[in-house]
């Protein structure tokens, strides 16, 4: 799930640690204990303590989101949905709750549910709104919806505010849909590559794979070779080069690559 835990924890602490009543102290104690257990990777104990805090304050949106997030981590999507929906009952247009719920619904191919919650996003120019319409278009095999959503995303740099790897993987999955899809996706990838490639290996692999799928072989080769030259951890990039040379039937480069890999191993 795409959610910045560090930010969530800071916000959660600022909201939850308030007041001085005994009930508030107990709630804060259970919440902090839950955080500590989560950091130790004891998710079950963390959930138990969050639930104790929840029994004291059932209308805390941050706490409801934390419980839902933990249920996702534990693989219980049904309960996670319930808690995200409880958060939206308390605060109907909470973007964080909507973002996380819609991500969960998309993973489960729940189109009807997505159609219900997407209109609750207030900012129709936001990345969250356009992302979920794009994903709905994928699930519905609606080429027009996919194109329109990607045009809006590519025309606005809001998608760069937070790295969303699942989004870039989704882009690769629609690479061959249409010329416009390729055009808008390429614009998005170029911006993401410029911003993230120096610190994030995965965007290099995903972008290169996209370029291979659309037969931009030389461009894919360039970014893979640049990564390989500058990084020792590069076996995945060599594997993508092999895929590239195989797809374009470049026997000479494929043979040279095999020699390099034999020496490397």
Each language-model region and where it sits:
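N-terminal leader/linker segments that initiate helical-solenoid repeat arrays
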Residues: 11, 17-66
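Canonical tetratricopeptide repeat
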Residues: 32, 66, 100, 132-135, ...
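Structural marker of alpha-solenoid helical repeat scaffolds
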Residues: 56, 90, 123-124, 156, ...
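Residue-level recognition of tetratricopeptide repeat
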Residues: 60, 94, 126-129, 160, ...
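Register position in tetratricopeptide repeats
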Residues: 39-40, 73-74, 104-108, 139-142, ...
């Amino acid at each position: 799930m795409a959610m910045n835990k560090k930010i969530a924890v800071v916000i959660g602490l600022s909201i939850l640690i308030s007041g001085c009543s005994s009930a508030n102290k107990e709630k804060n104690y259970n919440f902090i204990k839950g955080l500590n257990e989560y950091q130790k990777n004891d998710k079950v104990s963390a959930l138990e303590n969050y639930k104790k805090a929840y029994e004291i304050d059932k209308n805390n949106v941050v706490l409801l989101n934390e419980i839902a997030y933990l249920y996702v981590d534990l693989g219980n999507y049904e309960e996670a949905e319930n808690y995200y929906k409880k958060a939206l009952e308390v605060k109907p247009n909470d973007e964080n709750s909507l973002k996380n719920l819609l991500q969960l619904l998309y993973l489960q191919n729940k189109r009807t549910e997505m159609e219900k919650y997407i209109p609750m996003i207030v900012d129709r120019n936001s990345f969250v709104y356009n992302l979920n319409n794009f994903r709905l278009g994928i699930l519905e095999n609606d080429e027009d919806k996919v194109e329109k959503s990607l045009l809006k995303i590519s025309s606005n740099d809001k998608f760069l505010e937070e790295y969303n790897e699942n989004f870039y993987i989704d882009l690769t999955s629609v690479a061959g849909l249409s010329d416009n899809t390729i055009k808008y996706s390429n614009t998005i990838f170029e911006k993401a590559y410029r911003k993230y490639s120096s610190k994030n290996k995965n965007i290099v692999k995903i972008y290169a794979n996209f370029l291979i799928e659309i037969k931009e072989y030389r461009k894919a080769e360039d970014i893979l070779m640049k990564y390989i030259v500058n990084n020792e951890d590069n076996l995945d990039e060599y594997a993508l080069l092999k895929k590239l040379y195989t797809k374009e039937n470049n026997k000479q480069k494929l043979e040279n690559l095999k020699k390099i890999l034999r020496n490397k191993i």
